[in-house]
């Protein structure tokens, strides 16, 4: 069963939305994971057209996917602070070095395309999207909710790029209530 991202989570524009969906294959709050086993990972990749029917995916491939996902989540967390997670960036660059990508030129266009199939091809497609988003400035808007119990990755559509929560009405409100209670208990003590 695929994880349903709450409708409150602002969706990134295509094709970055695919990367957002990939990172959101783990529901931190509910403890669910679409990539928990090879069959689930295969199903998710096929549903999202990242893995052909004939391509296989073993446990090592699943572990690689989870590592890429969690590296992207760490970078989305760093986007909250407009900082750099150097270790996550190094890890992503290591994955990118193994990603079989090629440049495809068209009339008035150029894009990165995968030069492989299977799990490495799927990772290459995701990293090509990250590359394009980093170039056009949309990557910095992909953020992980600051609520550690949530961590849905959302697209910060605010004009000044200061979005903090996947939803102000849910996670932002929870934070405000906790802060209020902490202030109140501190004043009572």
Regions found by a protein language model. Give the residues of each.
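Short helix-coil boundary/hinge micro-motifs
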Residues: 1-144, 151, 188-189
């Amino acid at each position: 069963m695929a994880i349903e991202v709450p409708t409150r989570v602002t969706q990134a524009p295509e094709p970055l939305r695919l990367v957002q969906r990939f990172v959101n294959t783990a529901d931190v709050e509910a403890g669910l994971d679409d990539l928990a086993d090879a069959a689930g990972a295969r199903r998710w990749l096929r549903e999202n057209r990242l893995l052909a029917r004939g391509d296989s995916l073993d446990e090592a491939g699943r572990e690689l996917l989870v590592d890429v996902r969690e590296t992207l989540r760490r970078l989305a967390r760093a986007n909250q602070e407009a900082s750099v997670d150097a270790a996550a960036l190094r890890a992503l660059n290591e994955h990118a070095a193994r990603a079989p990508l090629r440049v495809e030129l068209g009339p008035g266009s150029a894009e990165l395309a995968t030069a492989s199939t299977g799990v490495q091809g799927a990772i290459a497609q995701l990293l090509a999207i990250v590359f394009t988003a980093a170039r056009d400035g949309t990557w910095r808007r992909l953020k992980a909710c600051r609520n550690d119990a949530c961590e849905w990755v959302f697209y910060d559509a605010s004009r000044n790029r200061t979005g903090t929560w996947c939803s102000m009405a849910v996670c932002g409100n929870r934070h405000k209530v906790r802060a209020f209670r902490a202030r109140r208990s501190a004043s009572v003590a």
